[in-house]
Each structure stands twice: as structure tokens, then as C-alpha cells.
């Protein structure tokens, strides 16, 4: 059944309810399965009803809203859920029968609580983990500031940028500062509505550019390490620190270190005491520092992936030569190492608890990953605009479109390295550069779906033909083609069918034409396309005769060629032979094209527009000609076939005519025998069959409607198959495609109706059995669950729903209710609307303190 079900407006009739009592000799093999449609539908229905009772009357189920898992939990109580049990009953001499059980159980109330600390809930663990993470980040930030602003460090580069003041001179450092500032500002605006827990007011404050200053600092620290031996020279280690920090001008007027910055501008630093939330300030500044460090680490691999040779003064020069290439990985490694050490010092004994450590790491890396990913996305966009958004010179512009894809992948964590645990960032940026000399040309009219599909299939057919082209001697092909049309005789001519022309044709001219094999592929598919497009343009409302006459007047006439699509015209021009084609060859080509056209026209007429006269007079001939036709639809006017099965002479005649290829199909196949290989013919015929489905799907009498009209009510449990089911199906034994269609239709019919054919002797029809193991639940919930199961089974066209294992009289009441509903002709939508009214009345009574007198089943018996 469809995924979208309008339960409240459903007109499906309700099913009957029975009591299931298993026999003594039935073995029950219980198995768990969670991929059942009835349970999924029941979970959707449950959620929709709960939304409706809560006041969301306009809510409807959307696909993807709930993913079905082993247990579908209640939104109100997390301890309850649905589950499904399957069991197979196997008897000797009979196939196994599949039964399923829908159960409602309770889980222990402490099943989902983590054993952390003194038994606190998982929310408390998350709260304290976030607080400790903020503290660790603040301590790491303090450590970084001490390293960067220490007296032993040598400042290599420092720049300052203010949002509301004019930019300084355009130096290399200024370009870097502008880029980073704009990137972080854009990132702050984008993520202001999606802040991580505990992020405070950094995101909202950073979106106001005039109130912010941004500082980028690059310092170097040299440390001397003595050698193990006295004669060894002391080793020198250089560490670079790159810091980028937001600073607010409204927090104070203190100078940094008592010194003025370049350009007579003052750097204001915010004191933690002036902030309302110290943890928000810590996590904001700490994550910004961490994210910028991670961005530096990412840009190393990005530049290596791009393999860019930069020779100008863009931002890539600074990122490549001064900051990123050598020192970003060390900064990130030191930062994470510092985090872990400080975390161990702060938490103490809690670090021995693996669950607590995992929670802290997950919280920390989720925050850091989100911020770093947002900043990375903005920086990549800006970097691409600087490096690639340039106008190409005229000498490299091409007539065709250019498409370049750059995959930007960051470094990932090394295996077995605890410092880089869970550190895995990836970013992809794809861009397409389209340069076309003919971009100023007038835009063509938008093509329809049929035209687009036709051109695509034409291109694919020609492409396959070029790969599989095998040339044969022209005389042999011509002889084969000249003799083929005479093999077919029409016993009962029909005005809708046109016989192929029989004209003497010189073999040598045929050889010249047949060498141009592309025209065969093109003409075969274009013929069907033009017919289909014309039919779609008319809306599929014209009769068979007028359709074929109009198609014949617009396709392959004797005085002018057909109007193919523009793509086909271009291909014909490119593939025309260089020598001049004589008039005789043109005439022969038109004759051959008319052969193909007549075949397509007869194909469509036999597939779609068979009239009653054709069915009565040409049953023998058309039955042999339908084997290659895809039997998707039947005629607009139902054919009057006899109720009895057809005589076996059809199958014998089919074998006599050559098996799968017969009639016009065999004629054309013989014509194309030596012109194309068998695989190419198969591809072309398959393409034409698929195109014919377009007309078939647009007809007014689909197979399902014919099945319902002719087969009657197939939902009756008394008859597994209606007697006249085969009236609306293809005859057995008339072809592989029709046999597959017949089997598919019967399978779908059985699945929708809950039947599987006439059961063998001694076997029972499969039963849908429901067993609810919710002993601790209330009677009200049990009754509501039983009603919902009954409604879901009715929507799935289950004839009888059996309940097993009831001790509180619910089965007896539900039996009476179902009998009453079936007698009154109630639908699924009416039952659900009554359930909603009862739930509203019950909630109103509980709100004012009244006690509901009637249970759900009793109320439905009185008011349904």
C-alpha cells in the first residue's frame, strides 16, 4: 500500500474480527522481524492519533518522519513500545504458513539509565560533562594565551581589523586579516540560529560587525634542549603559535600590555568578571581558538590536494608560506594534549570511569566539530572566490562547457593516536565553470518530457550502435531485405494496418543505403517517438482510427520528410555521406522508412487500440503478433472474450510461427538480420517497447480498473480467485512478457487482498493473528490498541483479524463492534473520527475532574 494514508478520510471498509485458538498439533516457531508493513502503518497511525488528540488537527504523516526500528516507542512514556513476533506453522505435506503477532510490552524503568556517579540520569551526566568541558576549554585557552603572550616569544606578525572603520593599507597581512574577519563574521551570522548548548551570546554578539575587533597573531617560540652527551650541541626547537580572537569594544578601555597598537588603535580585552556567564565566555573563546587551529590543520591538506602554484599576493600565499604548511598540525596536537591533561587534573577519579570519559569526549568534539566545520565552510567559499573566481582570457574559452570539481579533504586521525581521537573532518566543495561562446544566442523553447526522453534514447541508441556496428556484404543484406516482406501474409486486412510496400529494389542501391546503419536506429525510434508525442499532445482522447490517420499524415509522407527533433537534424547532417545521393536512393530510403513506420503503427494499434471487431475477427492473428508487445495496458473498450480459457491451438500456432518472434515483429527482424547484430536489434526493440509504455500509461482504462470492473469484489474471503479473472489478463502461453505480467498481477492481487490462491487440500488460508502481551497496561490503553490494530488491518484489506490471549473481555466487545460496523457499512475514516471524539471528551472530563463512565468499546458501540 502507499506510504501516504489519509486515515481520517479513508473510505476503506472495516474487516471482521475473530478469536484465534491454535490447534494442539501446530508447532509455533517464533521469530522476530521488524520490517513489516502493518506494524509500520500502525506506528504511523498511533502517532497521528496522538497528535490529533493533542490539538494538531491539521497534521498529516510525512514520509521519513518516523523511522521504524525494533521498538516503536510512545512519545508520552518511553518505557512502552510495540514489537512484532512471527511464527511459522508447518505440517507434514503442507507448506508453512506465516503468522505475525503484534505485542505491546513494558521495559524496566531503569533500563535506559546510565550507571554513572551515584545513579544520576543521563541528563545530569550530560549537564556536568558540558560544564567540565567548558572549564577544560577555559583552562586550555589560558594556557594558549600564556604561550602566545609570553615574554620569551617573538612576535612574527600581528594585525588588527575593526568592522566599522576603513581598512588599512593593502599589505599582505591586511589581506589575510580581512579574509579571516569576513569569514568568521559570515560564519557567525549563519550559525546564530543554531547555537550549541552552552555557547552563550557569542554567536549573537559576533554578528554585529561594528562592535567587534578581530586580532590575528603569529608568534614563534624557541626552546633549547640539552643533548645527552656533553659534546653534543644543544638542540633548538621552534614552535609557531597562530591566534585569532574576537574582542568586544564595549567591555573596557584597557590597553593590551600598556602599549599602543599600530595605527593608533587600541585593543580592548574582555574581563571574565564582567561577563554574566563565565562558562559561556569560556566555551565561546575556547572553541573559536580550537576551531581556528583545526582550520589551519585542514588547510594544509587542502592546499596539497589542490596542488596550486601561487605566484601572486593572494590569501593562498600567506596560508601556504607563513602559517599552514609546517606548523598547524603541531598546534592542534599540543591543544588536544593540553585538553586531556587539564581534564585529568580537574576530574580526578572520574577519569577512571570509561563511560564518563566517553561522554566528555563526545560533548567536546561535537562542539568543536560544529564550529570548525562552519568556519571551514565559510573560509573555503572565500578562498575559492579569491583563487578561482576570475574571468578567463578569450584564447582559452571553448564552445563546450567546462566542469571542474575540486574535492577538499582534511587530515584524519591517525590510528592508535589518543591525541587525535575522534578528530575527523571532511569538506567538499564542488564548482562548475561554464563558458560558452553561444551563450548570447536566443533561448530555445522548453522541451516537453516526451521530447527530452526521445532525444535521450536516440542518442543512446546511436551511441550503442557505433560500438557494436558490424558491417556485412551489401548484396547479402539487400537480398535478405528484399525477400523478407513477402514472408508475411495477412489473412484479415485491417484499415488500421498498412502492408509494407512490395517494390523491386536494386541490390546495389540497397547496399549503399544499408551501409548507413545509423538511419535504421534513428528511424526506428523516431517513428515511435513522433506517434507518442502526437498522442500525448492530443491528451489520449482520440479514437484509434483518427489517431493512426493523423499519425500517417504527419509521418513519412511521400512529398515531404518527417519533422524530427533538432538533435536528430544535426545528427543527420553530420552523418550524411559526402557523395551526392541520387533520387532513386532517396525513394528507396523512404520506402524502407515506411516499412519501419508501418511496423510501429501496427505495433501501437495492436497494443493499445484493439477494437471489438479486431478482437472477434483477428484473434488468431493478433494473438501471435502480441508476443513482442509489452502488455502493460488493455484497450480502451474492454474486449469481449469468452469466459472459458482459450483453446490450445494458439500455443501450437505460436510454436509454428517461430516462438517469440512472429507476425510483423518477425518480418522486421528478418529484414534487420544481416544489417545489425542481434544485441543491437534487442536494444532497439526494447527502447521502442519502453516508448510505447508512455501511451499505455496515458490510456483511460488501466489494468487495475479493468480488473476491479471485470473481476468483481475480490476481497471476499470465500473465493481466492474470481472465475472471470482471466478476462482482463493476457492468455496463458502467449509469450514470456505476458506470462510475467500475469504472474505479477496475480501476486499483487493476492498481496493486496490477503489471499494466496486456492489453498491445497488439507491446508488452511493464512490468518492474521494479533496477541497483545501488555499485562501491566490499563484497560483503556488495551482497548485503544485493539481498535487501532483492527483499523490498520482493515486498511490493509485483511478479511478477518484474529485476536488471541484475552482475559478482560475485549475480544467479545470488539467482535460485537466489528459486526455492527460491517452491518452499518462504516469506513476506516469514520471509526477513527469516532475514536478522536471519544478521546477529546475523555480529556475534557479529566480536565474538569469528572470520571469517564464508558470505556472506548462501549462508547463506540453506542455512538458509531
Swiss-Prot record:
Residues bearing the modification Phosphoserine: 12, 206, 405
Disruption phenotype: Male mice are sterile due to sperm morphology abnormalities. The absence of Akap3 affects the integrity of sperm structure, causing mislocalizations of sperm proteins.
Biased composition range(s): Basic and acidic residues: 219-235, 627-638
Residues that bear Phosphotyrosine: 406
Region Disordered, residue ranges: 190-235, 251-281, 619-638
GO biological process, one term: cell surface receptor protein serine/threonine kinase signaling pathway
Pfam families: AKAP_110
GO molecular function: protein kinase A binding
Disulfide feature: none
Assembly with partners or alone: Interacts with ROPN1 and ROPN1L. Interacts with QRICH2.
Name the record gives this protein: A-kinase anchor protein 3
Species lineage: Eukaryota, Metazoa, Chordata, Craniata, Vertebrata
Gene: Akap3
Amino acid at each position: 500500500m502507499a506510504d501516504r494514508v489519509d486515515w481520517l478520510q479513508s473510505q476503506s471498509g472495516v474487516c471482521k474480527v475473530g478469536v484465534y485458538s491454535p490447534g494442539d498439533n501446530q508447532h509455533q516457531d517464533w521469530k522476530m522481524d521488524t520490517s513489516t508493513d502493518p506494524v509500520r502503518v500502525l506506528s504511523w497511525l498511533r502517532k497521528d492519533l496522538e497528535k490529533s488528540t493533542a490539538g494538531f488537527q491539521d497534521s498529516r504523516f510525512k514520509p521519513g518522519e518516523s523511522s521504524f526500528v525494533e521498538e516503536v516507542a510512545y512519545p508520552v512514556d518511553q518505557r512502552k513500545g510495540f514489537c512484532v513476533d512471527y511464527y511459522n506453522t508447518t505440517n507434514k505435506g503442507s507448506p508453512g504458513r506465516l503468522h505475525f503477532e503484534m505485542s505491546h510490552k513494558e521495559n524496566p524503568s531503569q533500563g535506559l539509565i546510565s550507571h554513572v556517579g551515584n545513579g544520576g540520569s543521563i541528563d545530569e551526566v550530560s549537564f556536568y560533562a558540558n560544564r567540565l568541558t567548558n572549564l577544560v576549554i577555559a583552562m586550555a585557552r589560558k594556557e594558549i594565551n600564556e604561550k602566545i603572550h609570553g615574554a620569551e616569544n617573538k612576535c612574527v606578525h600581528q594585525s588588527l581589523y575593526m568592522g566599522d572603520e576603513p581598512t588599512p593599507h593593502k599589505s599582505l597581512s591586511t589581506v589575510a586579516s580581512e579574509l579571516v574577519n569576513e569569514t568568521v563574521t559570515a560564519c557567525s551570522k549563519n550559525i546564530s540560529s543554531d547555537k550549541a548548548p552552552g555557547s552563550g551570546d557569542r554567536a549573537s554578539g559576533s554578528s554585529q560587525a561594528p562592535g567587534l575587533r578581530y586580532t590575528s597573531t603569529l608568534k614563534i617560540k624557541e626552546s633549547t634542549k640539552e643533548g645527552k652527551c656533553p659534546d653534543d650541541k644543544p638542540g633548538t626547537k621552534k614552535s609557531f603559535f597562530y591566534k585569532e580572537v574576537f574582542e568586544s569594544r564595549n567591555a573596557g578601555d584597557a590597553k593590551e600590555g600598556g602599549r599602543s597598537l599600530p595605527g593608533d588603535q587600541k585593543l580592548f580585552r574582555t574581563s571574565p568578571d564582567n561577563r554574566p556567564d563565565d562558562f559561556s565566555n569560556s566555551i565561546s573563546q575556547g572553541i573559536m581558538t580550537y576551531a581556528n587551529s583545526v582550520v589551519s590543520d585542514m588547510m594544509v591538506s587542502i592546499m596539497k590536494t589542490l596542488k596550486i602554484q601561487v605566484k601572486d599576493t593572494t590569501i593562498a600565499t600567506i596560508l601556504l608560506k607563513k602559517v599552514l604548511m609546517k606548523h598547524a598540525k603541531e598546534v592542534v596536537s599540543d591543544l588536544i594534549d593540553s585538553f586531556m591533561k587539564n581534564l585529568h587534573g580537574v576530574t580526578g577519579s572520574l577519569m577512571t570511569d570509561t563511560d564518563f570519559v566517553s561522554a566528555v569526549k563526545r560533548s567536546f568534539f561535537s562542539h568543536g566539530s560544529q564550529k570548525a566545520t562552519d568556519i571551514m565552510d565559510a573560509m573555503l567559499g572565500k578562498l575559492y572566490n579569491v583563487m578561482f573566481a576570475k574571468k578567463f582570457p578569450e584564447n582559452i574559452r571553448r564552445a563546450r562547457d567546462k566542469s571542474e570539481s575540486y574535492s577538499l579533504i582534511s587530515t584524519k586521525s591517525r590510528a592508535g593516536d589518543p591525541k587525535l581521537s575522534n578528530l575527523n573532518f571532511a569538506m567538499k566543495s564542488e564548482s562548475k565553470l561554464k563558458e560558452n561562446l553561444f551563450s548570447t544566442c536566443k533561448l530555445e523553447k522548453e522541451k516537453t518530457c516526451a521530447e527530452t526522453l526521445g532525444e535521450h534514447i536516440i542518442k543512446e541508441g546511436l551511441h550503442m550502435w557505433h560500438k557494436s556496428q558490424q558491417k556485412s556484404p551489401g548484396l547479402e543484406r539487400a537480398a535478405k531485405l528484399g525477400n523478407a516482406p513477402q514472408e508475411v501474409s495477412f489473412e484479415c486486412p485491417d484499415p488500421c494496418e498498412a502492408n509494407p510496400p512490395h517494390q523491386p529494389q536494386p541490390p546495389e542501391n540497397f547496399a549503399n543505403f544499408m551501409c548507413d546503419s545509423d538511419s535504421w536506429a534513428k528511424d526506428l525510434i523516431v517513428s515511435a517517438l513522433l506517434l507518442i508525442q502526437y498522442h500525448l499532445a492530443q491528451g489520449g482522447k482520440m479514437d484509434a482510427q483518427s489517431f493512426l490517420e493523423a499519425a500517417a499524415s504527419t509521418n513519412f509522407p511521400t512529398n515531404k520528410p518527417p519533422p524530427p527533433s533538432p538533435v536528430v537534424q544535426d545528427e543527420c547532417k553530420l552523418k550524411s555521406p559526402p557523395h551526392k545521393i541520387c533520387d532513386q536512393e532517396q525513394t528507396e530510403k523512404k520506402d524502407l522508412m515506411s516499412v519501419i513506420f508501418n511496423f510501429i503503427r501496427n505495433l501501437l494499434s495492436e497494443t493499445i487500440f484493439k477494437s471489438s471487431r479486431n478482437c472477434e475477427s483477428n484473434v488468431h492473428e493478433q494473438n501471435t503478433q502480441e508476443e513482442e508487445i509489452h502488455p502493460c495496458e488493455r484497450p480502451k473498450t474492454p474486449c469481449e472474450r469468452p469466459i472459458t480459457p482459450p483453446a490450445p491451438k494458439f500455443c501450437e500456432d505460436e510454436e509454428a510461427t517461430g516462438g517469440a518472434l512472429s507476425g510483423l515483429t518477425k518480418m522486421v527482424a528478418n529484414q534487420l538480420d544481416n544489417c545489425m547484430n542481434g544485441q543491437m536489434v534487442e536494444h532497439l526493440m526494447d527502447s521502442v517497447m519502453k516508448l510505447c509504455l508512455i501511451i499505455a500509461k496515458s490510456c483511460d482504462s488501466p489494468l487495475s480498473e479493468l480488473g476491479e470492473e471485470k473481476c468483481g469484489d475480490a476481497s471476499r474471503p470465500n473465493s481466492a480467485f474470481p472465475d472471470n479473472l482471466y478476462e482482463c489478463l493476457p492468455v496463458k502461453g502467449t509469450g514470456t512478457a505476458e506470462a510475467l505480467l500475469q504472474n505479477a498481477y496475480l501476486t499483487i492481487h493476492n498481496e493486496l487482498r490477503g489471499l494466496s490462491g486456492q489453498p491445497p487440500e488439507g491446508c488452511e488460508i493464512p490468518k492474521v493473528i494479533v496477541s497483545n502481551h501488555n499485562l501491566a497496561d490499563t484497560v483503556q490503553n488495551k482497548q485503544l490498541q485493539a481498535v487501532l490494530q483492527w483499523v490498520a488491518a482493515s486498511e490493509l484489506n485483511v478479511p478477518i483479524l484474529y485476536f488471541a490471549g484475552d482475559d478482560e473481555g475485549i475480544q467479545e466487545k470488539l467482535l460485537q463492534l466489528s459486526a455492527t460496523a460491517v452491518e452499518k457499512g462504516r469506513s476506516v475514516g469514520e471509526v477513527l473520527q469516532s475514536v478522536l471524539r471519544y478521546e477529546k471528551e475523555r480529556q475534557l472530563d479529566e480536565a474538569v475532574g469528572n470520571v469517564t463512565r464508558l470505556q472506548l468499546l462501549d462508547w463506540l458501540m453506542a455512538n458509531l
